[in-house]
Amino acid sequence: MLIFVKSGENMLESILKNTSEIVSIEELTELLKKEEKIAYIGFEPSGRIHMGHYLQIRKMIDLQKAGFKIVILLADLHAYLNQKGTMDEVRALGEENRKVFEAMGLVADYVYGSEFQLKDEYTIDVYKLALSTTLNRARRSMEVIAREDENPKVASVVYPLMQVNDIKHLNADVAVGGMEQRKIHMLSREILPSMGYKAPVCIHNPVLTGLDGEGKMSSSKGNFIAVDDDEATIKKKMKNAFCPMKEVSGNPVLEIAKYYLKYPATVKRPEKFGGDLVLESYEALENAFVEGLHPMDVKNLVSEQLIEILRPIREKMNK
């Protein structure tokens, strides 16, 4: 696959698009000047890859086009510590996830955590990190990620230290993740320099709300659109999605419209309901919705575009 590398301001503009936060833009700008640079993201192997994952993968593709070598950590050992299944189960899921990422068009080095996280050098560094991190700081960094548990395991404290250590051992210049990763990434910027390693640039992407409007989109909750869902499934899920009239905040349908749809976009309606409506931007869509555009009109628009956006992935997965 050919990768067309962008240059100058176009690279930075592409990376900035649809991000929630970059720490820091100045450091990223300097990093873009280097010939060799690595960007990494870690994924706990998951049952289905959904639109929330796709938001992250698209950012990795932006970084790839900006000249970064991309490393995808298939975090099998992390998943095990986070009680997602046996090592064999999460490894099998990891292989399925890798195939989907490749179908998305991402060219990357895929690394399983268990390939390096059980080595002596890695383990010693985890001990060093443990000496540099208070118990409260480690636990706070996991609050958003770990499953709620009335009796948290010691593993929930080891997990963030391992994630910080991954950045060092993968030689990453940039760490990418959703906003739920922010506390761990900030921990890495604080303590890695004390071990003689650079503080990574951290790129945080939005976390999509689940289709039920409750919490984040998650394969374990079933409130997602998978990137390989067929047309009928996409339409059904979107039809049933939470989309309260005139409400923008926490609206999963509008979030998908914001981050995925191409504009100008046309809402197709019968003449008796006002006829077709051309929207030049997401802001125009949001304004129309607040002013009374029917949720089903928005859902139909999103379904129509999602089907086309995901078509190449479905076709590759079905070969």
UniProtKB/Swiss-Prot annotation:
Subcellular locations according to the entry: Cytoplasm
Motif ('KMSKS' region): 216-220
Residues annotated as binding ATP: 219
Superkingdom of the organism of origin: Archaea
Residues involved in L-tyrosine binding: 40, 159, 163, 166, 181
Keyword ATP-binding: yes
Any one GO molecular function term: tyrosine-tRNA ligase activity
Enzymatic reactions: tRNA(Tyr) + L-tyrosine + ATP = L-tyrosyl-tRNA(Tyr) + AMP + diphosphate + H(+)
Disulfide bonds: none
Major subcellular site: cytoplasm
Keywords from the named record: Aminoacyl-tRNA synthetase, ATP-binding, Cytoplasm, Ligase, Nucleotide-binding, Protein biosynthesis
Listed GO CC annotations: cytoplasm
Motif 'HIGH' region mapped to chain: 45-53
EC id: 6.1.1.1
PROSITE patterns per the UniProt record, alphabetical: AA_TRNA_LIGASE_I
Gene Ontology biological process terms, A to Z: tyrosyl-tRNA aminoacylation
HAMAP family registered for this protein in UniProt: Tyr_tRNA_synth_type3
UniProt subunit comment: Homodimer.
Family label: Belongs to the class-I aminoacyl-tRNA synthetase family. TyrS type 3 subfamily.
Function summary: Catalyzes the attachment of tyrosine to tRNA(Tyr) in a two-step reaction: tyrosine is first activated by ATP to form Tyr-AMP and then transferred to the acceptor end of tRNA(Tyr).
Full protein name: Tyrosine--tRNA ligase
